[in-house]
Amino acid sequence: MIVRLLLWNLADSKTTLEELRPRLEPSPNRTWISDETTERFGVIETWDDEPGDFPQEIVDLIGKEPEIAERFDVEG
């Protein structure tokens, strides 16, 4: 199993958390996360195989790639 973590700083992006929230579609392998105080937004994804494509609509709305994009193997 693979876990992927993607994080954006929205302070210097083209959008806000309020604009993003209605576009966040539920998914069994995706957990959306945010911190309004620090204007950060992201997602934690779990995959049985290679991670799938991230919704391009979200990247386009934010206007940049994530500042942090990490992939981890699940050990247990």
Please state what every model-predicted region is.
Residues 1-76:
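Short S/T/G/P-rich N-terminal loop/turn motif that feeds into the first structured element of a domain
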